[in-house]
Structure formats: structure tokens, C-alpha cells
Amino acid sequence: MINVQAKPAAAASLAAIAIAFLAGCSSTKPVSQDTSPKPATSPAAPVTTAAMADPAADLIGRGCAQYAAQNPTGPGSVAGMAQDPVATAASNNPMLSTLTSALSGKLNPDVNLVDTLNGGEYTVFAPTNAAFDKLPAATIDQLKTDAKLLSSILTYHVIAGQASPSRIDGTHQTLQGADLTVIGARDDLMVNNAGLVCGGVHTANATVYMIDTVLMPPAQ
């Protein structure tokens, strides 16, 4: 389990997951590095009674069945993740090991968001390992030394409050400050340009949507 303390700069730069600079490979626009937490612009639905009774009740996405089959029990299972706060739950998810490295200080020692993410109520759009594999090695190398950029990217994947699948569509202000847009429904959900792998995954303090692409904060 990750047990490292959030650094003051990182805690101040957000109020809470996943890492992005995909467009850095294909666009000349700079990535926004304003990491001051902003209030959410769209209300988040509370966790349903059914979800609290059955952690799998809200699952959506074509990748959910495969994930559940590969992780039927233990802390990385759907039921197991529901017992832990989100950063801890992500560290137990084999599809989110790269994300865990990014938010826990392993990728960049000046960016550690574990305590922050574990301490509030959030919706997290979590890029899978396969999503990070799309990024060039040079981008990952840059994030190892650019703490401000990494914090901006990570906080762009988080919105305040837990948004259930029935309420997730629409425009949401992220903790990074910029908006992201969720369209579609259930298996066809899109988060900006990212497709849904498996969403509606509950942790003790968050609702997680695993996505297939790392999101990029828009330039400001």
C-alpha cells in the first residue's frame, strides 16, 4: 500500500486521479499548468443504496466483465476496491499501476497526491496502463521532472463529488480548473476523446471510471 505523505505543493495544487499529455505528441498547444483547485460546476449524485449494498451494481463499460473475471477476489476486485479509499484502491488495481506511480511520488518525487485523494469525495477518470502506453517515452521523462505539469494533468482527471453513471454525462469542472465533457451512455461513454473501459467502480470515497486515453488539460 502506498504510504507516503503528500507534499505541500501538490496538496495545494489540487483537492484531489491519472496523467496526461497525449496531445503533447500531436499538438503544438501548450498544456495548461494552472493547478489551483476550482469548485465543481456540476452537482454529483450520491452513491446509491444499491451500490453500497452491491459494489458491482453501477458497473458500466465493455471491459468490466473481463476485469471482474481476472480479479474475482482480493483487494483488487470490484468488491475489494470498494473497501479502500481511492488512491489505495487504485494501487491494488493491476490495470492502474502506472497511474498509481504517477500520483504516489514514484514517477516524480515532488508530486504525491495520495493523502489528498484519499481524504475527500471524488469522481476519478483513471487512465489504464494501456492508456499510458500510448504516450511517447519522452513525455513520461518530462513528467518525471516537471512537477507543475504532472500535477496539472493529474488533477484534470478528478472532479469533486461522486457522480454515478446516471449523472456523469455533461460538462464538469475539474480540480485542475478546466472543464471536461462526458457524452454518451453506459458502454458508449466518452470522456473528451477517451473511451470508457470500465466505470461506476466504487471505492470508499470515490467513483472511478477507467478510460483508454490520458486526458490533456486545454491550453488557457
UniProtKB/Swiss-Prot annotation:
Signal peptide positions (record): 1-24
InterPro entries attached to this UniProt entry: Adhesion/Biosynth-related, FAS1_dom_sf, FAS1_domain
Protein known as: Cell surface glycolipoprotein MPT83
Mode of membrane association: Lipid-anchor
Record note on biotechnological use: Could be used in vaccine production; both recombinant protein and DNA vaccines stimulate antigen-specific T cell responses in mice.
Residues with lipid group (S-diacylglycerol cysteine): 25
Organism: Mycobacterium tuberculosis (strain ATCC 25618 / H37Rv)
GO MF terms held by the record: cell adhesion molecule binding
Compartments where located: Cell membrane; Secreted, Cell wall; Secreted
Functional note: Recombinant, non-modified protein stimulates secretion of cytokines (TNF-alpha, IL-6 and IL-12p40) by mouse macrophage cell lines in a TLR2-dependent fashion, which leads to increased host innate immunity responses against the bacterium. Serves as a strong human and mouse antigen T cell antigen during M.tuberculosis infection, inducing strong IFN-gamma expression.
Upregulating conditions: Highly expressed and immunogenic during infection of mice with live bacteria (at protein level).
N-palmitoyl cysteine: lipidated positions: 25
Cellular component aspect of the GO annotation: extracellular matrix; extracellular region; extracellular space; plasma membrane
Keywords, comma-separated and alphabetical: Cell membrane, Cell wall, Glycoprotein, Lipoprotein, Membrane, Palmitate, Secreted, Signal
Assembly information from the UniProt record: Interacts with host TLR2 (tested in mouse).
Keyword Cell membrane annotated: yes
Sequence ranges assigned to domain FAS1 in this UniProt record: 83-215
Glycosylation sites: 48-49
PTM: O-glycosylated. Contains 0-3 mannose residues attached to residues 48-49 in various configurations; the dominant glycoform is Thr-48(Man)/Thr-49(Man2) with an unusual Man(1->3)Man linkage, but Thr48(Man3)/Thr49(Man0) through to Thr48(Man0/)Thr49(Man3) are also seen.
Record GO biological process: cell adhesion; extracellular matrix organization
Keyword Secreted: yes
